[in-house]
């Protein structure tokens, strides 16, 4: 989500759970595995193709193009999210394989939608309805916020790396706990590993 949108969600959070692991399995359909090599270590994702096919196709397509390689995590909101996927590093850019912004995939019957924004959830960041490109965020805590952002995956390995990214010193931009890392945290390489059926 872009900064103006995310801060609105932050203000309506009614509580944070103290979950210490990643979310439980949420999909029973086709999934895609992703490896993100960062300057802090490796993060592995499972993408929910059955829940959000267009979003997953976009992420996979961009990864195969090498788009994410060298991009930073441009935003950290302590206890909430880390955010990346913008080649400008500002939170105002992005790209999609469709050549334009694309629509949300918010299906109330999808398992991931029902699960909500749990620790380890991977979802699309945007500046409003149907404005998705390449920016995404990873949840640091369970947050009961409105389901306005397409959930398309979860962290399966490397949540400790996500936490280490979240722990770095930031340049505050939206309060003392929300801003850009003082030292760039880079996605060195994003790789599509395999496809699997669950």
Label each PLM-derived region with a short phrase.
Residues 2-3, 9, 15-198:
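Cyclophilin-like peptidyl-prolyl cis-trans isomerases
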């Amino acid at each position: 989500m872009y900064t103006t949108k995310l801060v609105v969600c932050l203000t309506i959070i009614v509580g944070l759970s103290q979950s210490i692991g990643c979310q439980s399995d949420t999909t029973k359909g086709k999934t895609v595995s992703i490896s993100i090599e960062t300057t802090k270590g490796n993060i592995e994702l499972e993408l929910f193709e059955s829940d959000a096919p267009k979003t997953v196709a976009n992420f996979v397509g961009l990864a195969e193009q090498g788009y994410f390689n060298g991009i930073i995590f441009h935003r950290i909101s302590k206890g909430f999210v880390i955010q990346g996927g913008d080649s400008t590093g500002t939170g105002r850019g992005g790209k999609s394989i469709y050549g334009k912004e694309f629509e949300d995939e918010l299906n109330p019957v999808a398992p991931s939608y029902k699960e909500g924004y749990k620790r380890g959830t991977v979802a699309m960041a945007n500046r409003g309805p149907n404005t998705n490109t390449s920016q995404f965020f990873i949840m640091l805590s369970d947050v009961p916020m409105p389901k306005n952002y397409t959930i398309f995956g979860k962290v399966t390995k490397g949540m400790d790396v996500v936490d280490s990214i979240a722990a770095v010193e930031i340049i505050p931009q939206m309060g003392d706990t929300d801003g850009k890392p003082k030292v760039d945290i880079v996605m060195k390489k994003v790789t599509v590993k395999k496809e699997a059926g669950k």
